[in-house]
């Protein structure tokens, strides 16, 4: 999990004036697990439904939070499965050629804005 994930949900929880116990009860999770998430000490990333619950209750962007947690949203996961043979080559090329990576990411951002 990204270190930013824990900091983000902790700060958002405090901004909403929730205690860990209150938010955990809303999410139907143990407050000790929420504490581990906030401190980046959880043994595994939370499930997508928990992340979406955090986002809804803390007024955070669901997709961003899913990525920060180290997960891939279900719809993107399906796309990756459909094109699984192309992914290693794409990621390798992006790693080896930062300009190409920037171009791909910029084009993706421009497409989302339209």
Predicted regions and their residues:
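Interfacial/linker helices and their anchor residues that mediate assembly or domain coupling
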Residues: 70-114
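Short, basic-rich loop-to-helix N-cap that marks the start of a DNA-contacting helix
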Residues: 17, 25, 41-56
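DNA major-groove recognition helix of helix-turn-helix
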Residues: 38, 46, 69
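DNA-binding alpha-helical recognition surfaces that contact promoter or target DNA
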Residues: 7, 11, 25, 36, ...
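Intrinsically disordered, low-complexity basic tails/linkers immediately adjacent to helix-turn-helix/homeobox/MYB/SANT
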Residues: 56-62, 93-95
């Amino acid at each position: 999990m990204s270190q930013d994930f824990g900091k983000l949900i902790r700060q958002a929880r405090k901004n909403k004036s929730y205690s860990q116990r209150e938010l955990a009860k809303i999410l139907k999770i143990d407050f000790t697990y929420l504490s581990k998430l906030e401190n980046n000490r959880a043994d595994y990333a939370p499930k997508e439904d928990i992340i979406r619950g955090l986002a809804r209750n803390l007024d955070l962007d669901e997709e961003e939070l899913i990525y920060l947690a180290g997960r891939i949203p279900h719809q993107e996961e399906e796309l990756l499965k459909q094109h699984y043979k192309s992914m290693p080559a794409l990621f390798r090329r992006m790693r080896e050629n930062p300009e190409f990576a920037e171009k791909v990411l910029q084009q993706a951002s421009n497409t989302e804005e339209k």
